Swiss-Prot record:
EC numbers on record: 2.7.4.3
Binding-site residues for ATP, renumbered to this chain: 15-20, 128, 137-138, 200
Reaction(s) this enzyme catalyzes, per UniProt: AMP + ATP = 2 ADP
Binding site residues for Zn(2+): 131, 134, 151, 154
Binding locations of AMP: 36, 41, 62-64, 90-93, 97, 161, 172
Subcellular location: Cytoplasm
Gene name as annotated: adk
Homology family: Belongs to the adenylate kinase family.
Region (NMP): 35-64
Function: Catalyzes the reversible transfer of the terminal phosphate group between ATP and AMP. Plays an important role in cellular energy homeostasis and in adenine nucleotide metabolism.
Organism of this sequence: Mycoplasma genitalium (strain ATCC 33530 / DSM 19775 / NCTC 10195 / G37)
Assembly information from the UniProt record: Monomer.
Protein name: Adenylate kinase
Length: 214
């Protein structure tokens, strides 16, 4: 049986675990994980004009403007091999991004990681570290690297993101809640929205998503 082309989205506030779920999913399926955050960090790493602009916005807990985000995401989708489709991580976040996406693509299903305890989420983020080379994500509470301060994938140093602090997390959560409601409502009305508790075991979260893969 030939695999079909799946077009998925995963939504959720910062720290809900979108990246972790998607990376584990991509290891066991042919779905390509497309994270807007990774695209931003790659642009920042390249020190391009867009990258410097993005760095300034993210450091203050804001979101990158829609035009830049749309450009980076769509260019990735149209210029990279996607054998069984993709899962978009953290995109779209605004109505303008949603309008752009609807012109370009038809989405099959949307998974929303729901946060029921903000304090628990803040604790999770306070203990998050990333690889400064390949952007792999770890958590010092429940997903530690095999070697302290060293990435399992490339052995590079692990660092804490500048925006992983309580004040910025709260600011990003407030902004997320303000902007996500129209996105949530749109996909809910289309009967394409599946909500998943972000504090469930990862195996259960993955099982829920995998049942929709064609």
């Amino acid at each position: 049986m030939v695999a079909q082309f799946n077009k998925f989205i995963i939504l959720g506030p910062p720290g809900a675990g979108k990246g972790t779920v998607c990376k584990l999913l991509s290891k066991t399926t042919k779905l390509v994980h497309i994270a807007s955050g990774d695209l931003f960090r790659e642009a920042i790493k390249n020190q391009s004009v867009i990258g410097r602009k993005i760095a300034a916005i993210i450091s203050q807990g804001g979101y990158v403007d829609d035009a830049t985000t749309n450009q980076l995401v769509y260019e990735y989708i149209t210029t990279n091999p996607l054998p069984n489709g993709f899962i978009l991580d953290g995109y779209p976040r605004t109505e303008n991004q949603l309008d752009f996406l609807n012109i370009k693509l038809t989405i099959d299903m949307v998974f929303e990681l729901v946060v029921s305890d903000l304090n628990k989420l803040i604790t999770r983020i306070d203990n998050r570290v990333i690889c400064n080379n390949c952007n792999s994500v770890y958590n010092l509470l429940f997903q530690k690297p095999l070697v302290e301060n060293s990435c399992d994938q490339c052995s590079a140093k692990l660092v804490k993101r500048s925006d992983d602090n309580k004040a910025v997390v709260k600011a990003r959560m407030e902004l997320y809640q303000q902007t996500i409601q129209p996105i949530h409502t749109y996909f809910f009305n289309k009967q394409l929205l599946v909500q998943i508790d972000c504090f469930l075991p990862l195996e259960e979260q993955l099982k829920t998503i995998k049942q929709f893969i064609r």
